[in-house]
Amino acid sequence: MIARLQAAVGEPDARIIVRTASAIAELVGPLPLRAGDEWLTIGVEGQPHIHVRTADVAALAFAAPDDGNVAIEAHDAAGARIVRVAFSRTNPAKADCDVGRRAALIDRHGGAQ
């Protein structure tokens, strides 16, 4: 699961998003992901980065909706989204959609959940 998330954040133009009711933080990839004893670090220490508690990541969900970008989300045990990795310009409902890139991302990341 961690390797799959690492591959996703390493994609060009990946958007790593953390959202709460009051704030949204977004980093642009490709970014490294490092797994420590307790935390995953997305990005580089000393630069903007995100820490995700490894133990809280219970599942990854892949989505390729007809009206949105291809994305992978990390969820906790209750099903709440922790972090979302969306791939820009992969929304088929928009004129700037890169159809070939969308298909490649689906092939690369849309496999086993």
Enumerate the predicted regions with their spans:
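Surface-exposed, interaction-prone regions used to assemble/regulate multi-protein complexes
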Residues: 1-113
